């Protein structure tokens, strides 16, 4: 299932400053991560879905670029996002 409006607002309020703060890097990374986990589950059920696999790889690339930006701008926020989302060990 896709990302519903309720899940999206929940993620935005958890990682953003307000309910309308969608541009913050932490919010973007959290939304990308949620979409990536959903697509990963879909691809485990449908391994031959090449179009969704390409979308997944593009999302991973977008998340990587935003994380690199966040690391360059503010390393403490970067580390907090990694810890909150359990991205890297």
From Swiss-Prot:
Part of the 30S ribosomal subunit. Forms a bridge to the 50S subunit in the 70S ribosome, contacting the 23S rRNA. PROSITE patterns: RIBOSOMAL_S15. Pfam families: Ribosomal_S15. Keywords: Ribonucleoprotein, Ribosomal protein, RNA-binding, rRNA-binding. PANTHER family: RIBOSOMAL PROTEIN S15, BACTERIAL AND ORGANELLAR, SMALL RIBOSOMAL SUBUNIT PROTEIN US15M. GO terms for molecular function: rRNA binding; structural constituent of ribosome. GO terms for cellular component: cytosolic small ribosomal subunit. It comes from the Bacteria. It comes from Chlorobaculum tepidum (strain ATCC 49652 / DSM 12025 / NBRC 103806 / TLS) (Chlorobium tepidum). NCBIfam families: S15_bact. Belongs to the universal ribosomal protein uS15 family. One of the primary rRNA binding proteins, it binds directly to 16S rRNA where it helps nucleate assembly of the platform of the 30S subunit by binding and bridging several RNA helices of the 16S rRNA. This is Small ribosomal subunit protein uS15. GO terms for biological process: translation. HAMAP family: Ribosomal_uS15_B. SMART domains: Ribosomal_S15 (SM01387).
